[in-house]
Amino acid sequence: MSDLVKQKCEACRADAPRVANDELPDLLKQIPDWQPITTDSVLKLNKVFNFDSYSEAISFTNKIAQMAEEEDHHPAILLEWGRVEVTWWTHKIGGLHKNDFIAAAKTDSLNT
């Protein structure tokens, strides 16, 4: 399990620095199943989780929602039958902050 899971998201300001390009590979190694994607020129973290039923997918989505409230950092979530797509990025800075990697690692830890 990644050390990121043990960390807490910090309050993010509009002038907070984005994750630097040279930091990205090391952070991605800690969440190996997450894919960096770019949409609307914004770098984000994305992962699809698969489940055997809609109710399992909803249960997982609710766990993410609870964690997101506790961390005060919220993802985009697409819920479908047997599938939950989670995308993390920091709106205030229009890109990736360390909080996104912490939240991605915590999301992985909820999928038990």
Where are these regions (language model features)?
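Long, contiguous binding/interaction regions
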Residues: M1-W34, T38-T112
